[in-house]
Amino acid sequence: SEYASELAQADNNVLAPAPLTFGGRGDIRTSKAVKSISESTVVSNYDEDNFRSCCALFGEAQLKCFQMHYSPNAPSSQMESEGSANPSTIGSVSEGYVSESQGQESERSESEGSEGEDSEETEGAEEPHEQMESEGGDQEESEGAEQPQEQMESEGQEPESEEDVDSGEITDGSDMNMPGPGSSDGGVPLGLTEVDEQTSDGEEPEEPEEPGGEQGPHEQMESEGEGNESEEEEVEEPQEVIESEGQQSESEDPEKEEEEEERSG
């Protein structure tokens, strides 16, 4: 039996503890020994089990599984979109908030075209989202995070901020056909709960969790948008469609919202 083990080691080039039993399917003990070695190196990696559970999935499900487990602090859409504008923030999410918002300011001054990426970035990150609103439209700052984008579209005051919304429609990806405000409705819910409370300055008493929280901005938007009716009509229909989706995702737990954003992003 000693000779057999030596032979096995020479043939397989595997360093394994003797004695080896030779079965029809190779060295069972060898494979176990090797596995225990690899497991000992993996102990520090808490993602190993998650990784294995992901292996059972396919396609988008697998991708989502990886994204959930390998970026535990942030929805994956944020990780991806951070890379689109400033790659340096991909690695660290928490620092990403700071450098992201700085990156936005410099990009904003460079070109309006890159603002689409900004709006995509900030769909996932709540704090910079608030900053972007206050930088982008000063007069709308206190209206709440969701509404300024609707206002920009319906009032059409600033070409800059309007372009922000329009290109946000594409990069956000919640629905290619929707007008800007619609997509902001679909994409923002994740940030809504915090951002609304931070930026509202007491102007909107509604709680963002309740359907009423969305009702307020719509009514205001419609009354403001009366000046340019065609745009209002165009905006209004998808708004109602998205509104129900938005309410669903708001009323459910944050993980569902993250999933919804991953789907759209």
Swiss-Prot record:
Q: Disordered: where is this region?
A: 71-265
Keyword line = Cell adhesion, Developmental protein, Gastrulation, Glycoprotein, Repeat
Which residues lie within the region annotated 6 X approximate repeats? 75-257
UniProt entry tagged with the keyword Glycoprotein: yes
Q: Where are the sequence repeats?
A: 75-94, 105-124, 128-147, 148-167, 217-236, 238-257
Query: Would you list which residues are glycosylated?
Result: N228
Tissue-specific expression: First expressed in the vegetal plate and progressively the expression becomes restricted to a subset of endodermal cells as development proceeds.
Task: List all Polar residues biased stretches.
Answer: 73-92
Motif Cell attachment site, residue range(s) on this chain: 25-27
Q: Which GO terms describe its biological process?
A: cell adhesion; gastrulation
Return the Acidic residues bias intervals: 112-125, 133-144, 152-169, 194-212, 222-243, 250-265
Known role: May be an adhesion molecule involved in gastrulation of the sea urchin embryo.
> What is the protein's given name?
Protein ENDO16
